[in-house]
Curated annotation (Swiss-Prot):
GO biological process: apoptotic process; apoptotic signaling pathway; cellular response to hydroperoxide; cellular response to type II interferon; defense response to tumor cell; extrinsic apoptotic signaling pathway via death domain receptors; intracellular signal transduction; negative regulation of apoptotic process
Effect of S308D: Reduced Ca(2+)-calmodulin binding and Ca(2+)-calmodulin-independent kinase activity. Decreases apoptotic activity
Pfam families per UniProt: Ank, Ank_2, Ank_4, Death, Pkinase
Function: Calcium/calmodulin-dependent serine/threonine kinase involved in multiple cellular signaling pathways that trigger cell survival, apoptosis, and autophagy. Regulates both type I apoptotic and type II autophagic cell deaths signal, depending on the cellular setting. The former is caspase-dependent, while the latter is caspase-independent and is characterized by the accumulation of autophagic vesicles. Phosphorylates PIN1 resulting in inhibition of its catalytic activity, nuclear localization, and cellular function. Phosphorylates TPM1, enhancing stress fiber formation in endothelial cells. Isoform 2 cannot induce apoptosis but can induce membrane blebbing.
Gene that produces this protein: DAPK1
The protein, known as: Death-associated protein kinase 1
Classification via SMART domains: ANK (SM00248), DEATH (SM00005), S_TKc (SM00220)
PROSITE patterns the record matches: ANK_REP_REGION, ANK_REPEAT, DEATH_DOMAIN, PROTEIN_KINASE_ATP, PROTEIN_KINASE_DOM, PROTEIN_KINASE_ST, ROC
Protein species of origin: Homo sapiens (Human)
Impact reported for K42A: Loss of activity, apoptotic function and of autophosphorylation
Region (Autoinhibitory domain): 292-301
Subunit note: Interacts with KLHL20. Interacts (via death domain) with MAPK1 and MAPK3. Interacts with MAP1B (via N-terminus). Interacts with PRKD1 in an oxidative stress-regulated manner. Interacts with PIN1, PDCD6, BECN1, TSC2 and STX1A. Interacts (via kinase domain) with DAPK3 (via kinase domain). Interacts with GRINB. Interacts (via death domain) with UNC5B (via death domain). Interacts with UNC5C (via death domain).
Domains (record comment): The autoinhibitory domain sterically blocks the substrate peptide-binding site by making both hydrophobic and electrostatic contacts with the kinase core.
């Protein structure tokens, strides 16, 4: 942006008389103080906002200045200097004081063509100079052709006004519609490309007028003029051209040519015989021919008359366009104008509305006898309209022209009223100084202070009060300004009036005080302000309602809290005897009932009909309110005036559920017992959950058994036999002697994942961890489904146990067998009151130990959703408690001093690495516990016990204490489990109903939600929550976690060929779990994404976790009969490059099965599954989904016919959306990103395939490139071919990486940025400086936390900054990256490079018709909620 001189122009120049004015500019004579030289100062009004139409845009001003700076010619005006202030840009120009050329010529008695061409030649010379610089003026007309000095023998022409001038770039097409209709070229009218030729047309028109005094194309209307121009409709009439030479007419004809290419250029015109005669005869013909001076003088006179009228029509045009804008004030509306108003009145009002002071001044100057006090048709004089618009200059002008300061409109309002209505403080000061009356009432009894309050102008109200305006004046409705403020909710106005000393207890005609008005309308801040200034809280209206009654009736909870905190009378009765509690109970508003009861209201007050609040609630059948009133001690035996109890009223209205509750509470002893059950006791929560995670053989079961052993029992405890004696492949005796190969370990955990790219750019492993990552798992050489150990844990083993020296626990041991992982998301990380123990064996090499721990911690972290709002530094409020335990220290001969603890030499480095990665997400104990899992009495085991006991005590201390009802439910659960039989699932609603029906009728749903959460914490039940499972209680976790899933997923011997593909009949499932209701069980498993039912076949069920078939269809066949297009993506984790939890791919397969079954209604969709892969065919396109790169990526490859590119795009988008939905719902804490596969290598079936990462696209985009180099193939591939199969329709509607709006950054990305930028940086390179760079400095003061306050639970300032900044349309990911780099935060910018999406499709609804159902592709046919609801 060009920066002009910011100094005050008045410091350097003395400004004098006005020389002229335009729409947005005024030209004044000025004198330079330092030299005494005279110049013209052109004041151009700047446009305030982009959307505004008032003023000139910055771009247009800078263009005019740049052109003026470039030009220097005797016939063109020159620029001296440029200044700028808040409202204007001031151009200091050469003073052209000779007036217009045409005015000068009109004064002559006669003029030959020869004399005329001398002036015209100067114009042509000036235009020749401009065109040589490729500058087109675009506004050549008589008014812009001036004389430098008319008093010299040969006056010099000056071309002025370069406001429309443009530098023509012949490489870029330029179109616009501008200029004066009489002089514009046809290409402007027709909106065709413009060039220098447009000026030549204007010269032709000027010449025509100069010679004849007539305008060639002028019509009666603007439209007619433009039509004449477009049609080139002109002629040389004898009346005007009788004395005109043939050469002059030829000159004009060659210029007024419609085709710009055939029009004379400036060079041609200078060589034309009329301008430059070729012989004496041509020269003589010019001398003999004369300008038609009679007509020319008439033209000049007519022009001056038009200029007089033009001011009025200009005002009319400007204000009409102004009135159509959306940002006009209330005064600037059509209520001040009418077609029946005089033309002059309209012009005056238009000029006022548009702040056109010069225009109004000219207009009034030409209307010497006009009475400016006369009103328009609506009875509003101009002075009042000007007061409403707030322009003091116009007020001064009107008063100077005779406007009375006390003039009123037909409603009795004066100028103060109008200014107050629109909030013009300076205008009010001006009116007050000029003695305009303040407290004039209009016909409705209102004065200025009323209207200021009604429109929320606190500064105006404050000013009027300071001027002495009476704040207690009432209008015809007896309302004060404070009533108006209270009704409309203007706190600042109410505060100003209260501080001015107004009476806060005046009542209006309805008997309402301002407090009653504000309370009814819910303005708690005004209520608080009024109370602080002495408002009577118990003042009542005509119906006896106090403020609390009205707030309760209108459900204004914040007002109710304010009134109660201020001490209003809570038991006040209205004229019917109803207290606020009566009103709340009748309406059934539970939160208000609770608030009133907590304020110690009387529960048993009777109204005039003898009814207590309990009677009203019972009569209306509001069970929750009845229950709460009874709990709080309301009398159930109270009688109405006609002798009825609350129970009688409920029965008469057939509210049997209410009547039944009241019947059970008749005896006070029963009610007392129920109330006692709900009160907290001194008993602490008896147990919490201990969850153990680790790979098979890490010693989890042994560790639990050892922790259960007491001191005496530990002497007699027999060690569990080591499996290495019988299965050396599973537990090698020495990691050095029997180190497993990569292929063994990876094939067993991720069969079929070995086809990874070997080039460094395609590998997903982190530097330094590659070795360990490739050997993460030491699994049996057989397929993991073939269990080699009958003693190994099946699914999730759950037991209640007392751990000696620690306390009672519900112990949940999660099997290390990957086949069970697909069910862990419902149980692993759903309780922050649990202790999570990650166990690993020291038998493994250090790299494998580290990566096993990373695997499980990534799993736990991924299961925890992001909390909103994001906390300071991205921290979690309740991170999971994690303890790391290393086993087999005895076998590995870890050194241990006599009687001391094992000393593992790598514990510090392992803990440091783990805490660096997961310290913000998990609460990891500071110590790594190294022990022999079988030595229950060892020192190491004792240290672990002590640590677990400390954590347990800490957790239990913050858990709510037990209630008798909770203990009662625990004792009742066994009988409920027995009653439920094969289905141990129950909805929360059913649980609430059963407890209320069988155990305690006074327990509310909120009470029982808390109790259910406590039972969940103890492990008695499990609350299951997800998108498909909401508020479902698993009454017996062992039933599902151990019995059902343990049996179903550990199936060993297939009974049929299709079992290898994981397909089972309903009968097969029934045989696997014979004790369960198979239909309900399948719906449960379906909702958990463990299986997918094929509704088309009716009896088949897909269970991907049980698939044994491997390596089917892992790549496309080479034979292709038709031309195909290829494309694909790889979905990978962004941060920690560990394998996806195996279960996630099973869930992906389940959802893809479900999705393809939804698509296959026409029989053209098919899916084939195998271990870690599947192949889909749908509507002519084929798709592979593969788990690759040792489980660290999910690849989606699509191919289809060249003619079906859009189908391929939609299929890829739908399947990726399905996978991303599964990720988001199952692993909400895992951030993933899409990398793109080389379509050319996919087409050539070339492996390894080049992987394009987001940073590749961003780098290319920065360099303005639209293709990427395939370094493997040595060729380039375009963005469109990589991302959308070369489909230009899709590509054109998409946003690319840098241009994607920053609001698309997901919460996990924002949380990571908060973690990087929230903490104060020593060099200031944190969120504060970023806020300044993004243009939001106000947020720094608002969210700055450097005041020593604890930061743990403060909201993230970076998150707040992004939320604010992304409301602007120009906030793109690319802008954010560049701002971060400018800040010096390359770490944050590089993270964005890794995590940001590079392609966002914005397809319209029509394009997605084929895959409309993909929107909910991750949604199960069933939800557990629907299962248990029956």
């Amino acid at each position: 942006m060009t920066v002009f001189r910011q100094e005050n122009v008045d410091d350097y120049y003395d400004t004098g008389e006005e020389l002229g004015s335009g729409q947005f500019a005024v030209v004044k004579k000025c004198r330079e103080k330092s030299t005494g030289l005279q110049y013209a100062a052109k004041f151009i009004k700047k446009r305030r906002t982009k959307s505004s139409r008032r003023g000139v845009s910055r771009e247009d001003i800078e263009r005019e200045v740049s052109i003026l700076k470039e030009i220097q010619h005797p016939n063109v005006i020159t620029l001296h200097e440029v200044y700028e202030n808040k409202t204007d840009v001031i151009l200091i120009l050469e003073l052209v004081a000779g007036g217009e050329l045409f005015d000068f010529l009109a004064e002559k008695e006669s003029l030959t063509e020869e004399e005329a061409t001398e002036f015209l030649k100067q114009i042509l010379n000036g235009v020749y100079y401009l065109h040589s610089l490729q500058i087109a003026h675009f506004d050549l007309k008589p008014e812009n052709i001036m004389l430098l000095d008319r008093n010299v023998p040969k006056p010099r022409i000056k071309i002025i006004d370069f406001g429309l001038a443009h530098k023509i770039d012949f490489g870029n097409e330029f179109k616009n519609i501008f200029g004066t209709p009489e002089f514009v070229a046809p290409e402007i009218v027709n909106y065709e490309p413009l060039g220098l030729e447009a000026d030549m047309w204007s010269i032709g028109v000027i010449t025509y007028i100069l010679l004849s005094g007539a305008s060639p194309f002028l019509g009666d209307t603007k439209q007619e003029t433009l039509a004449n121009v477009s049609a080139v409709n002109y002629e040389f009439e004898d009346e005007y051209f009788s004395n005109t030479s043939a050469l002059a007419k030829d000159f004009i004809r060659r210029l007024l040519v419609k085709d710009p290419k055939k029009r004379m250029t400036i060079q041609d015109s200078l060589q034309h015989p009329w301008i430059k005669p070729k012989d004496t005869q041509q020269a003589l013909s010019r001398k003999a021919s004369a300008v038609n001076m009679e007509k020319f003088k008439k033209f000049a006179a007519r022009k001056k008359w038009k200029q007089s009228v033009r001011l009025i029509s200009l005002c009319q045009r400007l204000s009409r366009s102004f009135l159509s804008r959306s940002n006009m004030s209330v005064a600037r509306s059509d209520d001040t104008l009418d077609e029946e108003d005089s033309f002059v009145m309209k012009a005056i009002i238009h000029a006022i509305n548009d702040d056109n002071v010069p225009g109004l001044q000219h207009l009034l100057g030409s209307l010497s006898n006009y009475d400016v006090n006369q009103p328009n048709k609506h009875g509003t004089p101009p002075l009042l309209i000007a007061a409403g618009c707030g322009n003091i200059q116009i007020l001064q002008l009107l008063i100077k022209r005779g406007s009375r300061i006390d003039v009123q409109d037909k409603g009795g309002s004066n100028a103060v009223y109008w200014a107050a209505r629109h909030g013009h403080v300076d205008t009010l000061k001006f009116l007050s100084e000029n003695k305009c009356p303040l407290d004039v009432k209009d016909k409705s009894g209102e004065m200025a202070l009323h209207v200021a309050a009604r429109y929320g102008h606190a500064d105006v109200a404050q000013l009027l009060c300071s001027f002495g305006s009476n704040p207690n004046i009432q209008d015809k409705e007896e309302e004060t300004p404070l009533h108006c403020a209270a009704w409309h909710g203007y706190y600042s106005v109410a505060k100003a009036l209260c501080e001015a000393g107004c009476n806060v207890n005046i009542k209006n005609r309805e008997g309402e005080t301002p407090l009653l008005t504000a309370s009814a309308r819910g303005y708690h801040d005004i209520v608080e302000c009024l109370a602080e200034h002495g408002a009577d809280l118990n003042a009542c209206d005509k119906d006896g309602h106090i403020a609390l009654h009205l707030a309760v009736r209108r459900c204004q909870m914040e007002v109710i809290k304010t009134l109660l905190s201020q001490g209003c009378f809570v038991d006040y009765q209205d004229r019917h005897g109803n207290t606020p509690l009566h009103v709340a109970c009748k309406d059934g508003n539970m939160p208000i009932v609770v608030a009133l009861c907590e304020a110690n209201c009387n529960l048993d007050i009777s109204n005039k009909y003898g009814r207590t609040p309990l009677h009203l609630a019972a009569n209306n059948g509001i069970l929750d309110v009845v229950r709460y009133l009874c709990l709080m001690g309301a009398s159930v035996e109270a009688l109405t005036t006609d002798g009825k109890t609350a129970e009688d009223l409920a029965r008469s209205e057939q509210h049997e559920h209410v009547a039944g509750l009241l019947a059970r509470l008749r005896k006070d002893t029963h009610r007392g017992l129920f109330i006692q059950q709900l009160r907290p006791t001194q008993n602490l929560q008896p147990r919490i959950k201990l969850k153990l995670f680790g790979h098979s053989g890490s010693g989890k079961t042994t560790l639990v058994e050892s922790l259960k052993c007491g001191l005496l029992r530990s002497f007699f405890r027999r060690r569990r036999p080591r499996l290495s004696s019988t299965n050396s492949s599973r537990f090698p005796p020495s990691p050095l002697a029997s180190k497993p190969t990569v292929s063994v370990s990876i094939n067993n955990l991720y069969p079929g994942c070995e086809n990874v790219s070997v080039r460094s750019r395609s590998m997903m492993f982190e530097p330094g961890l590659t070795k360990g990552m490739l050997e993460v798992f030491v699994a049996p050489t057989h397929h993991p489904h073939c269990s080699a150990d009958d003693q190994s844990t099946k699914a999730i083993d759950i037991q209640n146990a007392y751990l000696n020296g620690v306390g009672d626990f519900s112990v949940w041991e999660f099997s290390g067998n990957p086949v069970y992982f697909c069910c862990y998301d419902y149980f692993a990380a759903n309780d922050p009151t649990s202790i999570h123990v990650v166990v690993f064996s020291l038998e493994e090499p250090y790299e494998i130990q580290l990566n096993q721990v990373i695997f499980w911690l990534s799993f736990l972290k991924s299961l925890v959703p992001v909390e909103e709002p994001i906390a300071f530094g991205g921290k979690l409020k309740n991170p999971l408690q994690v303890v790391l335990v290393a086993t087999h220290a005895d076998i590995m001969n870890v050194p241990r001093p006599a009687g001391g603890e094992f000393g593992y030499d790598k514990d510090t480095s392992l803990l440091k690495e783990i805490r660096n990665r997961f310290g913000n997400d998990l609460h990891i104990s500071n110590k790594l516990f190294v022990l022999d899992a079988g030595a229950s009495g060892s020192k190491d085991m004792k240290v672990l016990r002590n640590h677990l006991q400390e954590i347990r005590s800490q957790i239990v201390s913050v858990c709510p204490p037990m209630t008798h009802l909770c203990e009662k439910i625990i004792s009742t659960l066994p009988s409920w489990r027995k009653l439920n039989g094969p289905n141990q699932l129950m909805s929360l609603q059913q649980f609430v109903y059963d407890v209320q029906d069988q155990l305690n009728p006074l327990a509310s749903e909120e009470d029982l939600r808390r109790i259910a959460q406590q039972l969940h914490s103890t492990g008695e039940i499990n609350i299951m929550q997800s998108e498909t499972v909401q508020d479902v209680l698993l009454l017996d976790p062992r039933w599902l976690c151990t019995n059902v899933l343990g049996k179903l997923l550990s199936v060993e011997t297939p009974r049929a060929l299709h079992h290898y593909r994981g397909r089972y009949t309903v009968e097969d499932i029934q045989r696997l779990v014979p004790d369960s209701d198979v239909e309900e069980l399948l719906q449960i498993l379906d909702a958990m994404d463990i299986c997918a039912r094929d509704l088309s076949s009716g009896t088949m069920v897909d269970v991907p976790a049980l698939i044994k078939t491997d390596n089917l269809h892992r790549s496309w066949a080479d034979e292709e009969d038709e031309v195909m297009v290829y494309g694909g993506v790889r979905i990978v984790p962004v941060e920690h490059l560990t394998p996806f939890p195996c279960g996630i791919f099973h869930k992906v397969q389940v959802n893809l099965c479900r999705w393809i079954h939804q698509q296959s209604t026409e029989g053209d969709a098919d899916i084939r599954l195998w271990v870690n892969g599947c192949k889909l065919a749908n509507r002519g396109a084929e798709l592979l989904v593969l788990l690759v790169n040792h489980g660290q990526g999910i690849e989606v490859q699509v191919r289809g016919l060249e003619t079906e590119k859009i189908k391929c795009c939609l299929l890829l988008d739908s399947v990726c959306s399905t996978i991303e939905n599964v990720m988001a719902t199952t692993l909400p804490g895992l951030l993933t990103v899409k990398h793109y596969l080389s379509p050319q290598q996919l087409r050539e079936h070339h492996e390894p395939v080049m992987i394009y990462q987001p940073r590749d696209f961003f780098r290319a985009q920065t360099l303005k490139e639209t293709s990427l180099t395939n370094t493997m193939g040595g060729y380039k591939e375009s963005f469109s071919s990589i991302m959308c199969f070369g489909c230009h329709d899709v590509y054109s509607q998409a946003s690319l990486g840098m241009d994607i709006h920053a609001s698309d950054l997901n919460l996990l990305t924002r949380r990571k940025l908060s973690r990087l930028l929230d903490p104060p940086d020593p060099l200031g390179k944190d969120w504060c400086l970023l806020a300044m760079n993004l243009g939001l400095p106000d947020l720094v003061a608002k969210y700055n936390t450097s005041n020593g306050a604890p930061k743990d639970f403060l909201p993230s300032p970076l998150h707040a900054l992004l939320r604010e900044w992304t409301t602007y349309p120009e906030s793109t990911v690319g802008t954010l990256m560049s701002k971060l780099r400018e800040l010096g935060r390359r770490d944050a910018a590089d993270f964005l490079l890794k995590a940001s999406s590079v392609f966002k499709i914005n397809l319209d609804g029509n394009g997605q018709e084929a895959y409309a159902s993909s929107c909910n592709s991750g949604t199960s046919y069933n939800s557990i909620s629907s299962v248990v609801s029956r």
